[in-house]
């Protein structure tokens, strides 16, 4: 069992899953977001769950038994090369990628910062960039990919997405809005690096009562001559 922080629901709300859609949760363990997708779609989404760490799959199986939510496929592929393993495309993809976890740190609890280092952040940035490139290849034209982390680091959020946008001209960001005082838009720059201005449509959640730090960005694979709107979270 685990308690899911309120911030963890935001990536799924940004994904806006619908019944009968083919949806990939690329880093699914322990299954909290997957079960929320199933709940919002009344167990009618065609869910493919994947996690690159085999030992974490057991958590998904246990949660499925507890909550009785449905999925079609469960796999154990490294997300950085998942496009080489899955021979199909999806309407929507959730990429809640592994990160340094800065959003869960508590200065009153030094143990939460035990494993943090700048080198670790830079390592994750490289892996996140590869994961984003790989999963986007599995997205249908017109489809939506939501990228999320539980860290503040621009190196793991705006930076890999900004680099990704330079090399994927068929990708665009759809603005997200959430009317909470602890929510900010994406950063414009970091150090000497200026981000793609569209990243101001991403959301940064600052820690507050009941909410950990989080980053959420909604990416669309464009189809010619079509226009798309952003998403207001927490509203019908």
Language model segments and positions:
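S-adenosylmethionine
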Residues: 1-236
């Amino acid at each position: 069992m685990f308690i899911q922080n309120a911030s963890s629901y935001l990536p799924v709300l940004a994904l806006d899953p619908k019944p009968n859609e083919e949806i990939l949760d690329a880093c699914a363990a322990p299954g909290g977001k997957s079960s929320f997708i199933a709940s919002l779609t009344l167990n009618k989404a065609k869910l493919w769950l994947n996690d690159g760490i085999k030992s974490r799959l057991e958590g998904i199986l246990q949660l499925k038994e507890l909550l009785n939510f449905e999925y079609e496929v469960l796999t154990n592929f490294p997300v950085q090369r998942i496009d080489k393993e899955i021979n199909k495309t999806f309407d929507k993809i959730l990429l809640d990628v592994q990160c340094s976890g800065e959003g869960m740190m508590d200065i009153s609890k030094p143990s939460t910062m035990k494993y943090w280092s700048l080198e670790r952040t830079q390592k994750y940035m490289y892996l996140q960039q590869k994961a984003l490139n790989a999963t986007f290849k599995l997205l249908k034209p017109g489809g939506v990919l939501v990228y999320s982390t539980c860290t503040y680091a621009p190196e793991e959020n705006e930076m890999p997405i900004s680099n990704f946008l330079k090399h994927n001209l068929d990708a665009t960001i759809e603005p997200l809005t959430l009317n909470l005082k602890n929510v900010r838009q994406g950063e414009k720059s970091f150090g000497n690096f200026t981000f793609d201005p569209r990243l101001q449509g991403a959301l940064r959640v600052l820690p507050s009562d009941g909410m950990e730090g989080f980053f959420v960005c909604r990416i669309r694979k464009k189809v010619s001559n079509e226009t798309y709107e952003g998403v207001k979270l927490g509203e019908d």
